[in-house]
Amino acid sequence: MAKKKTKIDSEVKYEQELPLNPKKKRSGAYSKNKGNAYELKIVKELKELTGNDNISTSRANSKKLDDMKIDISDPDNAIPCYIQTKKTQSTPSVKKINAEVGLKDKPLCIIWNIQEKKEGNTNITSNGEYAIIPKDFFYELLKSHNDKR
């Protein structure tokens, strides 16, 4: 810790201790931009995977879907689930997110990019990406996979 000097009547006094490396506070805009960029990355991957160019972010395509907490718009039904993306350090609250989603006719898949602080808490990097899906939906995917074999 460094100390801030002040002069009072030719006498040096130490007022307070200041941290050498103050933590940088990230703004809400930073988090929003990070999340938007992650949505676009997932859209690009899904377009390549399905060959469907109509997949887009719900922000760009449907305010109604966006308000229902669904991040990826799929008007052609090329994806068997709704998608919510998260790029956070903390584990997403799956129960809360499922309760907030406005549509229930397809299962919800939460695609989570785990963020991790590194090197003095100033840099944040990805520590893996995971898809969180309901168990019943996982069993449907497994059955479909085995039926094709």
Where would I find each of the regions flagged by the language model?
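Compositionally biased, intrinsically disordered low-complexity segments
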Residues: 15, 45, 114-117
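Short glycine-/polar-rich loops that comprise or flank the Walker A/P-loop
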Residues: 105-108
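Glycine- and charge-rich intrinsically disordered segments
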Residues: 1-23
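Hydrophobic transmembrane signal anchors and adjacent membrane-proximal interface regions, especially
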Residues: 4-8, 27, 37, 92, ...
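Domain-level recognition of nuclease-like catalytic cores that cleave nucleotide substrates
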Residues: 2-4, 113-149
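Catalytic centers of nucleases
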Residues: 17, 24-103
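Conserved beta-strand segments of the P-loop GTPase G domain that flank and frequently precede/overlap
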Residues: 84-85, 110-113
